[in-house]
C-alpha cells in the first residue's frame, strides 16, 4: 500500500492518549455543567439526509455552498456527513416527538470541507446545547452556561463575550436591503467572496476577515437602526440579565452568525490567541428553525463550542490512576498472574498483564515506561510459596505478600494513593 495513503486524510488527524483525555475532560465538564442547567444528553447519527441541512442552513451559507460532504447511497438518497449539530437535533426533536421544553446536550464530530489550518480541520468536535421551547430569558441563561464552562476550564481570562441582536424578520429584511444598497456602491472594492455573498446574503459580508472588506464595513449601516420597539425591549432585557449575573460583555453591532436560521440574540465568546479562528463558543436564537422543518412554531436558543479550540487554550494534565503490572517469569506464573489480574480488576484496579516476561530487567523497564505504581513479580520460588514480590516503582522498595492477601494489599495501596492525590489537590487550591 502507498505510504501516503496510510496518512490521515487531509483535514483530519489522529488523537493520541493525552489529547483524548483532554477531549474527554472538556466533554465531561460540559456535560456536568449542562446537567446543572437541566440539560440531558442525546445523540444523532453522524450522517443525515441532505434535506435536513439544505432546508435549514440557507443557500447563502458557506456550508451549503462549498463545505458539505455529500454522497448518494445505494438506495438513491443523497446523504451528508453532518456539518453542524443544531439542525440534526431539531430533526430529532420533531421525529421523536420530544416534550417541550427540551434542553438537549450533544457532543461529537462534525465535518466541513474547509481549508485546513490551525484549529480548523475538516473533521472537528463540538459540545452543543439546544433549548427548545425557550423564552427570551433563556438567552442570558445559555450565555451563563457557556461562561461557567469557560470558568471550569480556567479560560475566562482568555475570552471576551460579544453580543448582538438581529431583531425580528422585519428587522433582518430591512437591514439586508440597506446593506445591499451600501455594498453595491463599493462592489468594485469588495473581495471575491464578498461579491459572491452580495448576491446571496449581504449580511454574511459582515463576517469577512478580508482587510479591504473590513475597511468598507466601517461605514456600513448597523442593524440596531432597524429594530422595532419589541426587538429593542427584548435585547435590552438580555443585557440587563447579563448585568444582573455579573457576566461581562460588549455589544458588537457587526456580529452576525454564519447560518440563515438565526434571529434575535446572537453571541460569540472570542479569543485573540487562535488567530483568525477566534470564536471559541458561539450561538444564538433560532425561533423559526423547527417550523422550517415542518415541526410547528418552537422558539429556541442554543450554542456550540469547538472542542479543538477549547483544548488549544485549556491547560490539562491527565492524572493517571493507580495501576499495577504483573511480571510472570514462567508459564505457571503467567497462569497465576492471569487469575490474580482478573480478581484485581474486579476490585476496580487498573492491571497490566502481558504474559511471560523473558527477562526481569526488561519487564521492569517496560513497567516503568507504562507508569505503573507496583510491579508484581511472580517466579517459580514465589509460586511455590504462594507469594508475590511487590516492587514499589517510585522507591524500589520490595515487599513479599501472600497471593491470598494480594487483593487487600493492592486495594489498600490504591486507597492511600487516592488520599494523597486529594490532599495534593486540596493543598494546591489553598
Swiss-Prot record:
Major localization class: cytoplasm
Keyword line: Aminoacyl-tRNA synthetase, ATP-binding, Cytoplasm, Ligase, Nucleotide-binding, Protein biosynthesis
One Pfam entry name: HGTP_anticodon
Lineage start: Bacteria, Pseudomonadati, Pseudomonadota, Alphaproteobacteria, Rickettsiales
CDD domains: HisRS-like_core (cd00773)
GO biological process, one term: histidyl-tRNA aminoacylation
Cellular localisation: Cytoplasm
Superkingdom of the organism of origin: Bacteria
GO molecular function ontology, one term from the record: ATP binding
E.C. code: 6.1.1.21
SUPFAM superfamilies: Class II aaRS ABD-related (SSF52954), Class II aaRS and biotin synthetases (SSF55681)
Known partners and oligomeric status: Homodimer.
InterPro entries xref list: aa-tRNA-synth_II, aa-tRNA-synth_II/BPL/LPL, Anticodon-bd, Anticodon-bd_dom_sf, His-tRNA-ligase, HisRS-like_core, HisRS/HisZ
Catalyzed chemical reaction(s): tRNA(His) + L-histidine + ATP = L-histidyl-tRNA(His) + AMP + diphosphate + H(+)
One Gene Ontology cellular component: cytoplasm
Family of the protein in this entry: Belongs to the class-II aminoacyl-tRNA synthetase family.
The protein, known as: Histidine--tRNA ligase
